[in-house]
C-alpha cells in the first residue's frame, strides 16, 4: 500500500492541483466562489445556460442550481438543448429563435467565464467542445447579477 501513495497523490494532483492538472481546468477559485453563492443570489426556480467546459455544469453539482447542461456531454439531437448553442450568438437579433428555445427550456440566466488561462493553470482551461458558442457574451440583452473575477452570472433580458 505504501508504494501506491505517491502514485495516488500524483493522480489526484493531475486532476485537482491547478499547477499540475494534465487535461485542463474546469473551475477556478473565483468561479467556485461565485457558484457556491449562486443559490443565494438566484431565484429558487432559476435555470442557467452556460458552457459546461467553462464550469457551468458545476452550478448544478456544487451550487444546487438547475442548468441546461449538467455534464459536458452533448445533448440529444433534435432537442431544444441541442439547437440552443448555435442559436445563442443571435440573442436579441430580429428573427432569432434564441428566445423561443430559452423559453421552452425555462432559461432566464446565463453563466460565463472569460479566463481561458484558468487563473494561471499550467494547461489552462479545459478544451471547448460543442459548447464553444456558449462562451460568447452578447453585447445586449443581459443584465449582470453577480461576478467574481472572470466568472459572471447574468439575467437574460432580451426575452422579456
Regions found by a protein language model. Name each.
Residues 2-160:
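Extracytoplasmic
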